[in-house]
């Protein structure tokens, strides 16, 4: 795991990280396929994107508070690649319904274990730099969400219109 220079305070015992890692590899075809989707490709370095994402998550919370949200077709490749995560870290979608429903389902599952949980939701296929700034922002957001019952959203300014994704209006 890369070393972070971030101010790594003791993680809040109620902060959890969910990682959206479903997808069927259609948007990034032909490099990405249903059998080898983008999150299993080393696009931001020499390691698969899911590995990079889990390492970022481990800078925020211990492995037992990470949940990978995925489809059945990716369960085994993820378990092999992320062997440090416990079996309960992998939440397999009962049905593919999209981002909102899978996050709601994961939140319900986590809140059953920890009624005071604060969720940090990450995407498995994002390259993030600089790491220290990202980690500080995630910690600050989780703290604000916990203390003030806020929803904290991070977005980047778009470089072009993209109908395949949602958007946030200020």
Name each region found by the language model.
Residues 130-170:
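Conserved core of the sugar-phosphate nucleotidyltransferase
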Residues 2-19, 26-30, 34, 42-123, ...:
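Conserved N-terminal catalytic core of the sugar/cofactor nucleotidyltransferase
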């Amino acid at each position: 795991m890369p070393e972070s220079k971030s101010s790594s305070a003791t993680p809040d015992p109620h902060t959890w990280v969910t990682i959206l890692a479903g997808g069927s590899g259609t948007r990034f075809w032909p490099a990405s396929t249903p059998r080898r989707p983008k999150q299993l490709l080393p696009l931001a370095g020499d390691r698969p994107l899911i590995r990079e994402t889990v390492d970022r998550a481990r800078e925020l919370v211990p492995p037992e508070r990470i949940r990978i949200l995925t489809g059945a077709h990716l369960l085994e490749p993820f378990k092999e690649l992320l062997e440090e995560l416990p079996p309960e870290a992998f939440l397999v979608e009962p049905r593919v319904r999209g981002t909102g429903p899978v996050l709601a389902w994961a939140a319900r599952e986590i809140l059953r274990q920890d009624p005071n949980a604060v969720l940090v939701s990450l995407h498995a296929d994002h390259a993030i730099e600089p790491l220290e700034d990202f980690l500080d922002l995630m910690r600050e957001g989780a703290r604000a969400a916990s203390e003030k019952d806020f929803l904290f959203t991070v977005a980047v300014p778009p470089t072009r219109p993209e109908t395949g994704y949602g958007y946030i209006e200020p």
